[in-house]
Regions:
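Conserved small/polar residues in nucleotide/adenosyl-binding loops
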Residues: 191-194
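Conserved phosphate/anionic-ligand binding catalytic regions in large, soluble enzymes, centered on
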Residues: 54-66
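Residues forming anionic-ligand binding surfaces in small-molecule and nucleic-acid pockets
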Residues: 68-71, 80-96, 175-186
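Active-site pocket-lining segments that scaffold enzyme catalytic pockets across diverse folds
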Residues: 9-12, 96-170
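Short acidic-glycine loop/turn motifs at beta-strand connectors
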Residues: 32-39, 71-76, 83, 140, ...
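Short helix/loop capping segments that flank catalytic or ligand/cofactor-binding pockets
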Residues: 40-41, 66-68, 142-146, 164-168, ...
Length: 194
């Protein structure tokens, strides 16, 4: 992406003591699906969502999500690891839940826009912290009865986070089995709320 000298000034945060929680950043990306197509999408500073009490996401959990991180490298560049694979998985998840997939190229571009707009929140190299990026999509119009929604919203927000496990993950001993208890064609490969 860009070198640290070209990046906006870092926010005044105690990077080393960040937990894995939400800190509102300056911008997020929003695109709406209506009448069979996605709109252009835009960055916004508004972190609120207003939906019907009968929205598909609330009544039938029609939602998919992804998660990835942006890092500052030793050379001062901000990088995101393979967002194209997250885009591909989100498309597969959306199709499985009968949701209109958000185009993969637009997904990757939206991730870049959000990171660039919030680069002051990307922790410095060596801090142990990262910028967590959360793309998600949900049925936004009123739906009563078990059926897919007609309108959707795709959003990406980000938040600076510390390690998920403070002090690092502790190793455990496990036994690996060939037995697979997942249902054939189930949702085990999808990122959904079920």
């Amino acid at each position: 992406m860009r070198k640290e000298a070209d990046i906006m000034e870092k926010k005044n945060l105690d990077w080393s003591s960040l937990g894995f929680g939400y800190i509102q950043t300056d911008k997020r990306y929003v695109s709406n699906y209506k009448n069979g197509s996605w709109d252009e999408g835009t960055l916004t500073s508004d972190a609120t969502i207003t939906i019907s009490e009968c929205a598909g996401v609330l009544q039938y959990a029609q939602t998919v999500f992804e998660g990835m991180k942006a890092y500052t490298t030793e050379k001062g560049q901000i990088v995101v690891f393979r967002p194209d694979l997250n885009a591909e998985r989100m498309v597969n998840s959306a199709k499985r839940l009968e949701m209109p997939p958000f185009p993969q190229d637009r997904f990757v571009d939206a991730v870049k826009q959000v990171v660039k707009a919030n680069e002051g929140y990307v922790p410095p190299y060596g801090s142990g912290a990262t910028l967590y990026i959360r793309p998600y999509m949900f049925g936004s119009d009123a739906v009563i009865g078990v059926k897919p929604a007609n309108e959707y919203q795709f959003r990406i927000f980000c938040t600076p986070v510390g390690p998920y496990f403070k002090g690092g993950a502790k190793p455990i001993t496990i036994r690996v089995s060939d037995y697979d208890r997942a249902a054939p064609n189930g949702t085990c490969l999808l990122y959904t709320s079920d």
